[in-house]
A protein has these predicted regions:
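Short functional hotspots at interaction and active-site rims
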Residues: 1-188
Length: 188
């Protein structure tokens, strides 16, 4: 059902020469994503970390053969969403069909006004509720947290920011990661 919901948007995007870009947000903190690991027999692995509520927010847009991302301290609000849409237009230099969830910032007046000011260069489509598996960017976040930064314990927030940026830049260069995100979403 949800895939049929997106089929019309996909056909129209191709007819209009638009890039289909999925957008999503996520967050990281100095508290690690703990995953199963190996250790010497008889020695329990210990993950020591700083308990801190400071959050690094991530926003990414993914096209079939590329990803564009930004990092922000704190939460992502409508201002950051508009700035990111501007960055996407500058990055891909083509009309865009943005597919994203129903986050309040995505539906804000500021975002709607900006999209209207682009002269049709951006069209928005909202994904069905409770369907994160339709967004390939969700699988990028899973890779980042469960593989690239799994059990990672930064000493400072700046170190977390540096590592997250480095791992996301690595994902940009590795087409196999982007392809696997699309494959897991089972959309195209």
């Amino acid at each position: 059902m949800a895939q049929a919901h997106l089929a019309g948007s996909k056909k129209n995007a191709r007819r209009e020469g638009r890039l289909i870009v999925f957008v999503d947000e996520s967050g990281l903190s100095e508290r690690p994503t703990r995953v199963r690991t190996w250790a010497v027999k008889g020695e329990t692995p210990v993950v020591q970390f700083h308990f801190n509520w400071h959050q690094l927010s991530l926003i990414a847009g993914m096209h079939f053969n590329g990803v564009c991302f930004r990092l922000h301290d704190g939460t992502i609000a409508k201002e950051q969403v508009v700035a990111f849409l501007k960055a996407l237009l500058a990055h891909w230099r083509r009309p865009l069909l943005i597919l994203w969830d129903n986050l309040q910032a995505h539906r804000s007046r500021m975002v709607r006004d900006y999209v209207a000011s682009t002269g049709g260069r951006i069209k928005l489509h909202f994904l069905p509720g409770y369907a994160p598996d339709l967004n390939p960017v969700e699988f990028l976040w899973a890779w980042l947290k469960r593989h690239a930064l799994a059990n990672y314990c930064p000493d400072t927030f700046a170190e977390l920011r540096h590592s997250a940026r480095g791992k996301l830049k690595s994902a940009q260069r590795r087409s196999i990661i982007i392809a696997s995100c699309w494959q897991q979403a089972e959309l195209f």
